[in-house]
Structures are given as C-alpha cells and as structure tokens.
Swiss-Prot record:
GO cellular component, one term: plasma membrane
UniProt-annotated binding residues for UDP-N-acetyl-alpha-D-glucosamine: T12, A13, G14, N126, R163, S198, Q296
Keyword Membrane included in the entry's annotation: yes
Protein name: UDP-N-acetylglucosamine--N-acetylmuramyl-(pentapeptide) pyrophosphoryl-undecaprenol N-acetylglucosamine transferase
Single GO biological process annotation from the record: cell division
Keywords: Cell cycle, Cell division, Cell membrane, Cell shape, Cell wall biogenesis/degradation, Glycosyltransferase, Membrane, Peptidoglycan synthesis, Transferase
Classification via NCBIfam families: murG (TIGR01133)
Amino acid sequence: MLRSVVLAGGGTAGHVEPALAVADALRAADPRARLTLLGTATGLEARLVPARGYELATVPKVPMPRRPTPALLKLPVRLFDAVRQAGATLDRVRADVVVGFGGYVSVPAYLAARRRGIPIVVHEANPLPGMANRLGARFTPFVATSYPSTPLRGATLTGIPLRAEILSLDRSPAAARAARARYGLDPHRPTLLVFGGSQGARSLNQVMTTAAHSLATAGVQVLHAAGPKNFEEVAAALPRGLPAPYELRPYLDDIMSAYAAADMTLCRSGAMTCAELAAVGLPAAYVPLPHGNGEQRRNALPTVEAGGGLLVEDAALDEDWLLANVLPVLTSAERLAKMSAACAGTGYPQAAAAIVAMVRDAAATRRRSRPRHAAS
C-alpha cells in the first residue's frame, strides 16, 4: 500500500498536468494514499493544484543559468535553501516515493530524496530531457519517457499521462454536433480549431485573418482562440460577413469541448498538446515554435510520420499553404477519418497506469531495504 507520495512538477502545463494526471491515477488506485504536489508559489500549479483538490507544498524557484551570469553566483545558496525546504516537506509527509516531472522544483526534490534514501521516479515529457531530469535519472532505475528517442539510459517508454476526461472524450458525430452548437457553430459544417496555447500565437492569428474568407467560402467554419492579449487586434482584422461561422474567443476555458467540436486543428506542438490530440484522435497541422532547441518539431514528428498530422515551419505558414494542405483534408471525410485513426494510433492511453505501477515498484524497494513506518 502506498502511504505518501510527493509529486514534483511546476511552472508550466507540461510539468503540472502530467503530475496531476498521475496524482489522479494514484488516488483512484489507492484513495487512502497521501498525495502532495511540490511546486512554486508563482507557477501554474499555484492555481491548478488546489483546484483539483490536492495539497500544494512550495519551494523557491531556482532557475539554472545556462551561461555565466551574476545569477550563477547566487545559485548555491538558492539551491541549498530549496533543497532544505523540499526535504522538510518530505519529512513532514513521510514520503515513500518522490515522482519528478522536470522543471525548477524537481532538482531540489531529487536531491532531498536522494539524501534521505527515498526512491525516485522520473517522468520526462519531451524528446530531449531537461537538466533536472538528466540529474534525476542518475539516481534511479525508475525512469519513464514519452518518446522512443529520448536519450535516458534504461528508461521505460510510457507516453505522457493524461487526465481521464481526455482519454474518455466522446468525439462521435453526435457529440461533435452538440459541442458545435454550444459554441454557436453550425452542427454539420467541417470545423477547424485554431489555438496557440494560453497566450495565443501571432503567426497563427495572422494567417487566419488572411485565410478566413477563403476557408469560409469553401464551407469551413472556425473556432479560434486568439489569446487575451491579441484578441482585439485579431477581431479588428477579421473580415466581416463571412459565409460560414467564425467563432473568435480570447481563450478556451473548456478545451475538451473544443476538441469534440473540431475535425482538425491548427496549433503549436507542445508536448501536452501533441499527447492530448493523439489521445482523442484529432488530426492537426502543427506549427512548431520557431525558437529554442527544435523541441516542438520533435514533439510532432511521431504523429506526422504516422500520417496523423501535418507539419509546417512557422516562417512557411501562410494562406497558400493552409489552402493547399489543410483545406483538402477538412473537406474530405475519408482523409479526415484516415488521419484521425493514424493520430490515435500514436497515443499512449495507459501512460498514467504505467507510472503508477512504477511508483509501486519504487516504493517496494524502499520497504525491502529499510522499513520506514512503525505499525500503529
């Protein structure tokens, strides 16, 4: 029986959502287990974790400078303090296992757990592991990855754990018609969902303002989340009197309903987005972020190579590309069905269950090597 598990992951949805999905699976498997999420006071977790009914313990954010800067001089003191606070949480909740998902809080969690001999489980959501999980993977044989190419020795491929609501989403024709009606869309038209994350994406917004009329003329309707900062600008740029519905919103507060309404999506290719679209079998035209280490392109490649999506570089995204590549899919029920099946085939619906099993195995090693809790 699991008595107490600490899940460390914060800052971005790519760290927080997998942690919450595993917490949900752990709670379903053992309702008596104490589950504590370790994060920061300012990250996304500060809102999401309490809203999902879990205890949030916090540590200071400790960014790891990638090059010599004055901040590097302060790193040892900041890290020492974060490890001390993480350790205090592990002691307080009498943690049996620490599960880390990368990001700022995982390094102090891994170091504090190792000092106490608490087993560690590492989950890496991206094709290229970050610094935190490269460190954590050195301390444990219990390492889960989301892509076959992830270079962590001895890792088990599990995929990204997702909420049960995503895995059970109904995308039947009847559900699609109902979801479209909730957004004020035509229940029967082919529907393109456009979103660029919580803040939108400028290049996606720009191409939609130029392509909106051509798409509408071809019979395609659009559900478009432009981002709160860009909403007014996009609203002003969209043509008026379109011959098909165009529902523009600042953001989508119910992404699952949007997935149910859509036949295809135009979006960035963050790890969570790719995993969710694969889970629900929703084909996408992926537009990776044009900066960074190429991570978003790698995220989309398995689905694209399987035939479940399209890939276009940010600089190449324009109206001509959209009309030549996305429109023919949206207007062909046969192509949509094939892409949807191919997309769904790249998902990992058992990811959370696989990580729960890994957590149990890790806890068993602790019990065999050093009993922690006296019988009461």
